[in-house]
Amino acid sequence: MKGKEQQMAINIAILGFGTVGSGVAETLDINKELITKRVGEEINVKYILDIRDFPESKFANLVTHNADEVFDSDILIAVETIGGARIAYEYTKRALSLGISVVTSNKELVSTHGPELIKIAQENNCYYLFEAAVGGGIPIIRPLYKCLAANKITKIAGIVNGTTNYILSQMKDEGIDFDTALKQAQANGFAEANPSADIDGIDAQRKISILSTIANDGAYIAPDQISAEGISAITNDDFEFASSIGCDIKLIALYEAGEDKPVVYVAPTLVAKSNLLFNVSGVFNAIMVEGNSLGQAMFYGQGAGTLPTASAVCGDILEAAMSNPTENRTWTEESVAITPYDEIAADIVVRADVPAKIITAAEGYECEVLSDEAILVKGIRHKDIASLVSETGAKSWMHYLK
């Protein structure tokens, strides 16, 4: 990290003063004394870079519109909370190339350009840190890298998108349809005006890309390899069916180490009541991690919001300020192959009027009768599901998580 030994305070710049950026400034301000004590030096916000002015903000005097003013200064850490993968990419690359550590909550940028940006950070003896990119305020990136470093991570299953979990919770609890629940989410500030990244599973796809790459020892798994199915086709009838077999419906992002290649996908899933993810409702996130020594552990908390996300960002600021940048983890530059979606062996629940037909047609697979119209079929390859459904006249099927 450039010039740290020459400064009495650690100067930082916040790039983008929206929901998360403003939360970072607020968190650093209200916890200033505590943070200084823990770091041993003051964390000083020197600049806030944004195209807008914020005359009502107590940080208004720190705002600049000039990127050159920021990057030509003595800042040691840049907080990238711009979002997207264009301007944020340019600024992040510029900062890292100058030896300025970057911390971010930008899952799109991390999932698409992570290998390149981590490499640039290593080459310039600085950090690229992204705890807040997955799970908002939930600690998950650092635990995977550090606390669970002695484990082979065999499985990750998570509810990693608060918008979709809120919508599904409202559909179940209030008995309303998808469109009404989406409008409620937008009215309450839990969904964007254009919610496609959330409801189509793209946001979850990016997040499981990051978690999978870390679990896969830095062998990069690009988001565009990962099959992602959203929630817009879920109906109230689906929830009635789920309830009848003791399940709830969640949008699950899944990683499994696999015997040959990793298994990674995002899909609406019937979650059994015995699973800890069953009780995760509203905008909350939860991530189940399974390690070969650990067994199972669940990380739970607020997956979005100004201060929860800012909390994770500020944790990275402190790590960049106190740690040795040689601890950077490497990601491979090229994406590694994962199991093709059609070849994935999954547990599914098939809904049919005549369960016996399913059992007969699914010969060779382990089956379990869950109700008069529900059959659990274990380990069936995705490419075989369509023929099973069409041959038996089944109504529908969905992934199952016990």
Residue ranges of each PLM-predicted region?
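Glycine-rich Rossmann-fold phosphate-binding loop(s) that bind the pyrophosphate
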Residues: 17
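N-terminal Rossmann-fold NAD(P) dinucleotide-binding loop
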Residues: 21
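NAD(P)-binding Rossmann-fold cofactor-contacting core
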Residues: 30-57
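Rossmann-fold NAD(P) dinucleotide-binding segment
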Residues: 67-105
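Rossmann-fold NAD(P)-binding glycine/threonine-rich loop
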Residues: 89-94, 107-134, 141-144
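Catalytic, metal-anchored helix/loop core of enzyme active sites in primary metabolism
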Residues: 153-157, 165-168, 172, 184, ...
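Substrate-binding/catalytic subdomain of NAD(P)-dependent oxidoreductase enzymes
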Residues: 180-279, 284-286
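A conserved regulatory-domain signal marking ACT and ACT-like small-molecule sensing domains
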Residues: 317-319, 323-402
